[in-house]
């Protein structure tokens, strides 16, 4: 039975779904939206979508047969049976207005993901940090075990060459997005919570208690026979555990974890540790990712796999051979500067805790290298809300190149931009950051800043990732001709 035939069989269980043939995505170029669109294309739906710019996601969807419109317009939705929107889309978007006038159902991304999960064994991964890596690790473990899951991930899984794929089994492994509380639409069999911190607080009215309660509600979407896999190292997770009335499996470095990491060590890009599980033999593991935070992500994957009775041999092999995720401590090789070769790492982390974890991993793996960070803050609201935390963590590198805020559609907030943050870090007195007005200007500064043997870390969720790829490909005009090793 082909994948499409398998899904048509599932659709026959819901006769009403036969009415839905054409699905249009507004904002299809995002990783989450594009991933769901890719699964639906492969399930046999006629998929179209629009976005303001062409990117790798839209290019891939075109190759798969989706019709992509660059730019938004009312004509794009005329033939749609349903319109899927991301929360980043303005309600006054002409396609949304047209869909309302035509009485075409409009659903959020998470609602469509929930429909994909409805007749599958869903594994949903939530948390402030680590969702993409944890989801990727779980998908890799299940794939290694021959379970062939469907997955939807917020980043490129390097081994698959995509962030989403339609599998032939009953499993669906997906990120659960708390940024707009839409993860409450999901009804999985297994839920993972990696950690809980203050982020996207506008969604929750600035009320951290409301955010915590929403995570509890998310876990209570599990059936009574479902499993909540949670990180006991996180203090907020420990705080909400007494409120969770589902079966709980904990993981972490703590002695009271059900799935515990011991004997941690890191050398370069790889970590070694022992995992101890109740009622199971200890496993000595190699993880092809750096940092203690990634060991925690691996523990979550191990906990899920163990609950589903996946063989230990698949766990061992999948972790050792894991090829990583795009923009998650992605080693892009070395590139040449006038003063010598520099190691280049690109990372998506944009919350102070994520940046701190990345710095810690870089220090542990390459202690001899000078750490130069080019950081692009993401969103004015996040910069404002976590301003002091950003000052603290960004002061920990050896050299800081600070770009202006990537707005992600937000209006500027006085005192929460890159220049203000740069001044505040300078006043702290640990280092003298260099303000970079635009990503394009970064190339002009780097030759004077970088030294032989440096580790350059490009950090942030905005468009700085595209710049790092150009650096890796020696496209910025200051290469001395040394060989550049670009890793996927």
Swiss-Prot record:
Pathway: Cell wall biogenesis; peptidoglycan biosynthesis. GO terms for cellular component: cytoplasm. It comes from the Bacteria. Its EC number is 6.3.2.8. Gene3D superfamilies: Mur ligase, C-terminal domain, Mur-like, catalytic domain, NAD(P)-binding Rossmann-like Domain. GO terms for biological process: cell division; cell wall organization; peptidoglycan biosynthetic process; regulation of cell shape. Pfam families: Mur_ligase (PF01225), Mur_ligase_C (PF02875), Mur_ligase_M (PF08245). ATP binds at residues 127-133. One of its GO terms (molecular function) is UDP-N-acetylmuramate-L-alanine ligase activity. InterPro entries: Mur-like_cat_sf, Mur_ligase_C, Mur_ligase_C_dom_sf, Mur_ligase_cen, Mur_ligase_N, MurCDEF_pg_biosynth, UDP-N-AcMur_Ala_ligase_MurC. Cell wall formation. PANTHER family: UDP-N-ACETYLMURAMATE--L-ALANINE LIGASE, UDP-N-ACETYLMURAMATE--L-ALANINE LIGASE-RELATED. Belongs to the MurCDEF family. This is UDP-N-acetylmuramate--L-alanine ligase. It comes from Shewanella oneidensis (strain ATCC 700550 / JCM 31522 / CIP 106686 / LMG 19005 / NCIMB 14063 / MR-1).
């Amino acid at each position: 039975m082909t994948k499409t035939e398998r899904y048509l069989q599932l659709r026959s269980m819901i006769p009403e779904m036969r009415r839905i043939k054409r699905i249009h995505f507004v904002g299809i170029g995002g990783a989450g939206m594009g991933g769901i669109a890719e699964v639906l294309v492969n399930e046999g739906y006629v998929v179209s979508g629009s976005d303001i710019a062409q990117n790798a996601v839209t290019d891939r969807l075109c190759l798969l047969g989706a019709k992509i419109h660059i730019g938004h317009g009312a004509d794009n939705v005329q033939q749609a049976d349903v319109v899927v929107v991301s929360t980043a889309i303005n309600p006054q978007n002409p396609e949304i207005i047209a869909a309302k006038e035509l009485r075409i159902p409009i659903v959020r991304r998470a609602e469509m993901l929930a429909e994909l999960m409805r007749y599958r064994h869903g594994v949903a991964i939530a948390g402030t940090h680590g969702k993409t890596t944890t989801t990727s690790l779980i998908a890799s473990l299940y794939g290694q075990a021959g379970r062939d899951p469907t997955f939807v991930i917020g980043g490129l899984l390097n081994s698959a060459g995509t962030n989403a794929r339609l599998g032939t089994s009953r499993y669906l492994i997906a990120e659960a997005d708390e940024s707009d509380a839409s993860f409450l639409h999901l009804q999985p069999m297994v839920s993972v919570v990696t950690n809980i911190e203050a982020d996207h607080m506008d969604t929750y009215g600035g009320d951290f208690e409301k955010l915590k309660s929403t995570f509890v509600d998310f876990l209570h979407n599990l059936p009574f026979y479902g499993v909540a896999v949670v990180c006991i190292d996180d203090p907020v997770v420990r705080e909400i555990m007494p409120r969770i009335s589902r079966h709980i499996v904990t993981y972490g470095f703590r002695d009271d974890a059900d799935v515990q990491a011991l004997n941690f060590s890191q050398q370069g890009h790889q970590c070694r540790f022992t995992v101890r599980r109740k009622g199971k033999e200890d496993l000595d593991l190699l993880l092809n990712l750096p940092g203690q935070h990634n060991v925690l992500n691996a523990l979550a994957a191990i906990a899920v796999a163990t609950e589903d009775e996946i063989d230990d041999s698949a766990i061992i092999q999948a972790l050792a051979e894991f090829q990583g995720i795009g923009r998650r401590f992605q080693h892009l090789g070395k590139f040449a500067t006038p003063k010598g070769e520099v190691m280049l790492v690109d990372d998506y982390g944009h919350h102070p805790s994520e940046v701190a974890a990345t710095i810690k991993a870089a220090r542990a793996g390459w202690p001899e290298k000078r750490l130069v960070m080019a950081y692009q803050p993401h969103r004015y609201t996040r910069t404002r809300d976590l301003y002091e935390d950003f000052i603290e963590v960004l002061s920990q590198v050896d050299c800081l190149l600070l770009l202006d805020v990537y707005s992600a559609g937000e209006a500027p907030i006085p005192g929460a931009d890159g220049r203000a943050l740069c001044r505040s870090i300078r006043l702290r007195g640990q280092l003298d950051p260099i303000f970079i007005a635009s990503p394009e200007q970064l190339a002009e500064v780097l030759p004077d800043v970088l030294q032989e043997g440096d580790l350059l870390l490009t950090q942030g969720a905005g468009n700085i990732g595209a710049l790092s790829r150009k650096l890796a490909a020696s496209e910025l005009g200051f290469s001395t001709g040394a060989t550049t090793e670009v890793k996927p």
